């Protein structure tokens, strides 16, 4: 079984083709393990589709399934084009969501993440019990719960240095309280936003999270009046361009092909596949 590894903004994924839909949870946990597997933030299983160029099943590194992942959508788009599964412009199915892909340059990929939903506006009082003394989060007056394919909690700090002082235990507590990914961001100017994401399913900070960037972008646009196009810079420091149009959130940036790996017999023997 051959796995192809791609990275989108530091968010890395293993991609494999399958002609049968089955549960890949155990396989995802093993191959995504940083020390005992190939190492990745998630596993993408590319499947045939009657109505689309292809469809996927997406698994986080802990084996949990997710309907959507922004960076993975760009990675799988490039994979599909490079392996003659789909043309430069195509549409695939991610769970119940149609994702359109456009390859602008050899490694610049744009995906349309579709529409978003504001789930809740949460005053800081509802979150205070999770904060430690002198927490950076104490100065965030309001949090925003936004669905961009998966749920994200978004809060904005007043200075960029606050992003380097985030407490993992606080973010983990918020993640379980709201069953969402946690994004803390800083608006440097109207067109540049820095952020860090604590990702559900990875259970740690990740170098980038596409749906998280989309949620931060939407929160900034709606509640802080930023423009319809902005550069978002995650932990990896790779800038991505997000724009809001009538038919959804468009998300553009570089994708890198890292390499290929072949599955060893040990995984088969353990019953993961």
Swiss-Prot record:
Localization per Swiss-Prot or TrEMBL: Cytoplasm
Entry's EC annotation: 5.1.1.7
Predominant location: cytoplasm
SUPFAM superfamilies, sorted: Diaminopimelate epimerase-like
Uppermost EC category: isomerase
Binding site for substrate: 11, 60, 70-71, 181, 199-200, 210-211
Catalyses which reaction(s): (2S,6S)-2,6-diaminopimelate = meso-2,6-diaminopimelate
Superkingdom of source: Bacteria
Residue numbers annotated as active site: 69 (proton donor), 209 (proton acceptor)
One example GO MF annotation: diaminopimelate epimerase activity
Keywords: Amino-acid biosynthesis, Cytoplasm, Isomerase, Lysine biosynthesis
The keyword Membrane is assigned to this record: no
InterPro entries assigned: DAP_epimerase_AS, DAP_epimerase_DapF
Biological pathway: Amino-acid biosynthesis; L-lysine biosynthesis via DAP pathway; DL-2,6-diaminopimelate from LL-2,6-diaminopimelate: step 1/1
A biological process from GO: lysine biosynthetic process via diaminopimelate
PROSITE patterns on file: DAP_EPIMERASE
Site for Could be important to modulate the pK values of the two catalytic cysteine residues, residues: 152, 199
GO cellular component: cytosol
Similarity comment: family membership: Belongs to the diaminopimelate epimerase family.
Function, in words: Catalyzes the stereoinversion of LL-2,6-diaminopimelate (L,L-DAP) to meso-diaminopimelate (meso-DAP), a precursor of L-lysine and an essential component of the bacterial peptidoglycan.
PANTHER family assigned: DIAMINOPIMELATE EPIMERASE, DIAMINOPIMELATE EPIMERASE, CHLOROPLASTIC
Subunit structure, interactors included: Homodimer.
Name of the protein this chain belongs to: Diaminopimelate epimerase
């Amino acid at each position: 079984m051959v796995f192809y590894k791609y990275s989108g903004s530091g968010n890395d994924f293993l991609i494999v083709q399958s002609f049968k839909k089955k549960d890949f949870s155990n396989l995802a946990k093993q191959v995504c393990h940083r020390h005992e597997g190939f190492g990745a933030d998630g596993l993408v299983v590319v499947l045939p589709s009657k109505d689309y160029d292809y469809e996927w099943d997406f698994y986080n590194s802990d084996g949990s399934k997710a309907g959507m992942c922004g960076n993975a959508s760009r990675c799988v788009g490039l994979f599909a084009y490079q392996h003659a599964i789909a043309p430069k412009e195509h549409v695939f199915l991610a769970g119940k969501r149609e994702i359109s892909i456009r390859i602008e340059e050899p490694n610049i990929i744009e995906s349309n993440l579709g529409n978003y939903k504001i789930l809740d506006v949460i005053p800081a009082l509802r979150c205070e019990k999770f904060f430690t003394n002198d927490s950076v989060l104490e100065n965030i007056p309001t949090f925003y719960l936004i669905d961009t394919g998966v749920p994200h909690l978004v809060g904005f700090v007043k200075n960029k240095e606050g992003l380097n002082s985030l407490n993992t235990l606080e973010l983990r507590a918020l993640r379980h309280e709201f069953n969402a990914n946690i994004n803390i961001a800083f608006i440097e100017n109207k067109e540049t936003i820095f952020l860090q994401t604590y990702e559900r399913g990875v259970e740690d900070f990740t170098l980038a999270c596409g749906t998280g960037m989309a949620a931060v972008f939407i929160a900034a646009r709606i509640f802080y009046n930023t423009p319809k196009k902005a550069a978002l810079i995650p932990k990896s420091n790779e800038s991505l361009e997000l724009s809001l149009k009538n038919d959804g959130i468009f998300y553009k940036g570089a994708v890198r092909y890292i390499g290929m790996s072949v599955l060893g017999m040990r995984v088969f023997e353990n019953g993961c596949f």
